């Protein structure tokens, strides 16, 4: 799929993509899903991450990640939804606290598509505890290792399990827990706190 350009359809050519319109992504995803819906979902993960990086990322972040996403070297996933919050992202509870040059992430996420397979998480957390609405949120480009034969989440500070679904073979969903999971400060999208909801 990466050789066909599926993961970089709308990424600009200067970052290794094909530079096509959103319509192309929709058509390709629909056609792949017609054969196997789980495969059709793969390109959309890359689409979400690339869009966030293009909209809000620094030039250094664009250069670091977009080429690798377009080539399929990096497989990203969106880590937004939470238990009891669902898609009401303005009120999410997962926290990120800056300590020295890294953020410590604590909290829980759910319904994370391809969570164990991914190398990179677009991770939405609350970095300002004094704000309880969308203004206190920040987006991170959080790197992690892929699953192993023994563990879904071998990274220090991560745990979780698969959510069994009916009828959507191949598109695996996960619960993820963070316990002082470390993200370098330079992986804050756009290198500015409080812009997470704007990026969405």
Language-model-detected regions and their locations in the chain:
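A short core secondary-structure module
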Residues: 102, 106-157
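Internal helix-loop-helix
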Residues: 3-73, 114-120, 131-132
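A structural signal for short hydrophobic beta-strand segments in well-ordered beta-sheet cores
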Residues: 94-96
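A short, Trp-centered hydrophobic/proline-enriched beta-strand micro-motif
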Residues: 72-80, 124
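Short Gly/Pro-enriched turn/cap motifs at secondary-structure boundaries
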Residues: 42, 69, 84-87, 111-114, ...
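A glycine-rich, basic-preceded beta-loop-alpha segment at the flavin cofactor/substrate interface
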Residues: 24, 146-162, 172-200
């Amino acid at each position: 799929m990466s050789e066909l350009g599926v993961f970089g359809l709308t990424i600009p050519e200067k970052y290794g993509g094909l530079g096509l319109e959103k319509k192309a992504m929709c058509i390709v995803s629909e056609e792949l899903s017609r054969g196997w819906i789980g495969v059709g979902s793969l390109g959309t993960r890359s689409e979400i991450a690339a869009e966030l990086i293009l909209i809000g990322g620094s030039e250094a972040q664009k250069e670091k990640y977009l080429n690798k996403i377009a080539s399929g070297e990096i497989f990203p996933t969106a880590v937004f939804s939470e238990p009891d919050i669902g898609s009401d992202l303005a009120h999410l509870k997962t926290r990120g606290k800056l300590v020295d040059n890294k953020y410590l992430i604590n909290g829980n996420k759910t319904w994370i598509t391809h969570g164990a397979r991914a190398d990179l998480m677009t991770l939405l957390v609350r970095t300002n505890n004094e704000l309880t609405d969308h203004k206190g949120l920040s987006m991170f480009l959080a790197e992690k290792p892929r699953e192993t034969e023994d563990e879904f989440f071998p990274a220090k500070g991560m745990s979780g399990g698969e959510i069994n679904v009916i009828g959507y073979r191949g598109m695996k969903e996960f619960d993820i827990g963070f316990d002082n999971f470390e993200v370098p400060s330079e992986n804050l999208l756009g290198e500015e706190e409080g812009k997470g909801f704007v990026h969405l």
